[in-house]
Amino acid sequence: MLSNTLIIACLLVIGTTIALIAVQKASSKTGIKQKSYQPSIIIAGPQNSGKTSLLTLLTTDSVRPTVVSQEPLSAADYDGSGVTLVDFPGHVKLRYKLSDYLKTRAKFVKGLIFMVDSTVDPKKLTTTAEFLVDILSITESSCENGIDILIACNKSELFTARPPSKIKDALESEIQKVIERRKKSLNEVERKINEEDYAENTLDVLQSTDGFKFANLEASVVAFEGSINKRKISQWREWIDEKL
């Protein structure tokens, strides 16, 4: 009897241990699948457009000289909203950091502020347009309604600044050229069929029969002028408040 009782007790211990291990593994897998992120608003754009200055002004109500950063800067729980502001570096070689972020967290992004320098010659917007195409290719294909974008036209106080409508039109025209060049490149370069189809499909998402237009995107895209140095960012603040 004693030996039988001992055997049964051992079997119960072994069975319980196996069950606990199974539960832990299941919990671990579930945790990974259900991983969530804090909602965020992204600040992006070319170098020297005022991204970090905007983050500083929004979070400290002060204007300070900026330092070039190679890593994203963030401010959690902006204005007590539970939303994190994330400023991404604008250097061409570091733009992949934003792409990686969007590919994993697009559904948690409540809006994207794309900073531009209002004084830049429209003829020199090629790299800016390429950056926007990279962003839109992800946001428009990853989210049912895209991610709303504010084109924040900084340095509007300067004499050479152009109005937001002109900047928006120039970007539309340049983005269309970027899309055409990339499609042509895809047709000329031999690639794996699945990779080529994916790249072409993401570009098709951005085009309609009349070419590229911000108005035809799933997301809303607006352009407002402002000046960080003059602390005139009321329109930008209103847009942010709507997203919180």
Curated annotation (Swiss-Prot):
Residues recorded as binding GTP, renumbered to this chain, are 45-53, 66-69, 90, 154-157
Listed transmembrane segments? 7-23
Which Pfam families does this one have?
A: SRPRB
Source domain of life is Eukaryota
Q: Which UniProt keywords apply?
A: Endoplasmic reticulum, GTP-binding, Membrane, Nucleotide-binding, Receptor, Transmembrane, Transmembrane helix
One GO term describing the cellular component: signal recognition particle receptor complex
CDD domains linked to this entry: SR_beta (cd04105)
| GO-annotated biological processes | protein targeting to ER; SRP-dependent cotranslational protein targeting to membrane, signal sequence recognition
Which SUPFAM superfamilies is this protein grouped with?
A: P-loop containing nucleoside triphosphate hydrolases
Q: Name one GO molecular function term.
A: identical protein binding
Q: Where in the cell is it found?
A: Endoplasmic reticulum membrane
Instruction: Kindly give the membrane topology term recorded for this protein.
Output: Single-pass membrane protein
Principal cellular location given in the protein's record = endoplasmic reticulum
Outline what the protein does.
Component of the signal recognition particle (SRP) complex receptor (SR). Ensures, in conjunction with the SRP complex, the correct targeting of the nascent secretory proteins to the endoplasmic reticulum membrane system. May mediate the membrane association of SR.
> What family is this?
Belongs to the SRP receptor beta subunit family.
Tell me more from the record: Present with 8250 molecules/cell in log phase SD medium.
**Assembly notes:** Heterodimer of an alpha and a beta chain.
Q: What is this protein called?
A: Signal recognition particle receptor subunit beta
Originating gene: SRP102
